[in-house]
């Protein structure tokens, strides 16, 4: 999770298209399942059924004063950033990799969301917490389009973007045909 959080952090702070492509390529070069999850997240193909903005507000109200959060959110203007900064870190746990964390969240039942998801948020660093909230709400807004991801993959594997686009809609997680 630390590596993916770092990737998103670098992507959002990088204005250069070519630098973003290089960052994506460096991440996708790794031969592990995390790159498949990263691709699913960056191409908006991953969603969580029970974790929405309203649920996150409910959870944060259990952790901090509602007025303090509301004032902070008004000032910051971004839900994920506000929650990641104001959420009390109880203990920073051992960093899980992206795939393990996502699989653990997918296993959470609706009745367990409040306790289990709160515990997960409490164990993450601010940057990891921000990343997880962005993933769960589906609103990354980091300056990376699906086309940019395709361009990075095409350059990485010496293919044309058209070749990637031809197979794109037929791909299924974990994207073995692509990687």
Spans of model-derived segments:
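N-terminal nucleic-acid-engaging modules of covalent nucleotidyltransferase systems
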Residues: 1-179
